């Protein structure tokens, strides 16, 4: 009797956990059979004849065996259904995580002092299945940290290229950290607008690690920041870093400001009505669509606005960007102003406006007829043609001395002419270079002249110090003579460069109006 009651209790528990209708029907039928069997057993009890007891015992044993077989079948079906559910859940997780490969995230890293989250890049999904802290199946992701602060976080450059000869356990650098998918957080992009004095930041040093420091000053125009690095192991604690080499850290004050801003925003939203919000959203969307349309269909000039600033110290275009200007649109808040800057024009001196208009009409109404750029280009073309004609004229001119050197003395005695030709070729070669190249070459030659003068001073000191050694004196004098010849050559080159630079300056003065 007790065994039947225990079997009935097991069937009732299985009935509570069953989700399939077919299983519930089978369990209900089995429960009814057990209840009837228990009722029959209680009714007959001790009243059953002795000759029927063996037959009744055999029936009970058969019923018990059938009950056990049905329970085992139900347990097997439940376990198989659970396994199928787990496989389906794992396949969905792998599909979800595979789609995240290549995305940025924030992943945990266990340090000696605790766990901290760092920005990382998802590079793959591990085959191993794990159970997270909540007892749920989960997969592990392989991530590479984008702002490594310790050597074990630093990605292996050979592994990224597929050429690392060591496995993950033996390599000194990281082949990717394995983290569970449930521990991944949202990526925290750097907010450079938060850069201010005493702001804690991570700075990238030549060892490819990000070191902690504090901001001393910020230049938002040049996008350069001076940082004082923490620790005593840095020889130069104060360094200048570009914005892309910094990562501003979040402080408690930032979190409080975000919370207060969220609270104020929520209160303002609660106070305003839904109709006003929809109207503002419609206006903002219409304005953005209009600005995008203007930027797409507005005339695009060949040169971008502010292209000339790379040759000057101008910051006008950068200030316009700070004030909200969108490249490709016109000036003004609505973007309907001019796109190209106003070009300066120089009218003929002493002529009336009517005469200037007649000149423009004679040029088929060319609007750029009096532009400064056009006049400068025209003057440059004229000067270039004049230089070419002068060079051809000088190269073809033959005087009496050249005739005597060529005809009477022979080609072996015309060294002076060859030097002149070489000098002209050198001057023509200098004319082909830009002003910036000439300035760099002048600085280099000046450094070589100073170095050669120092070498000559050292040789002179050696001559004075070793006046008694004849052999050494002879070698030092040969070195001194060689240094003098090289110095004379460098000084001649310096004079040629200086002459060319002076010629260009005088030409520029001639072109100024």
UniProtKB/Swiss-Prot annotation:
Residues 252-261, 273-283 have a biased composition (Acidic residues). InterPro entries: G_patch_dom (IPR000467), Znf_CCCH (IPR000571). Residues 477-495 have a biased composition (Polar residues). Residues 312-358 form the G-patch domain. A zinc finger (C3H1-type) spans 155-178. GO terms for molecular function: DNA-binding transcription repressor activity, RNA polymerase II-specific; RNA polymerase II cis-regulatory region sequence-specific DNA binding; zinc ion binding. Residues 252-283, 411-430, 477-513 are annotated as: Disordered. It is found in: Nucleus. Its main location: nucleus. Keywords: DNA-binding, Metal-binding, Nucleus, Repressor, Transcription, Transcription regulation, Zinc, Zinc-finger. Pfam families: G-patch (PF01585). It comes from the Eukaryota. SMART domains: G_patch. Residues 496-513 have a biased composition (Basic and acidic residues). GO terms for cellular component: nucleus. Transcription repressor. This is Zinc finger CCCH-type with G patch domain-containing protein. It comes from Drosophila sechellia. The lineage of its organism: Eukaryota, Metazoa, Ecdysozoa, Arthropoda, Hexapoda.
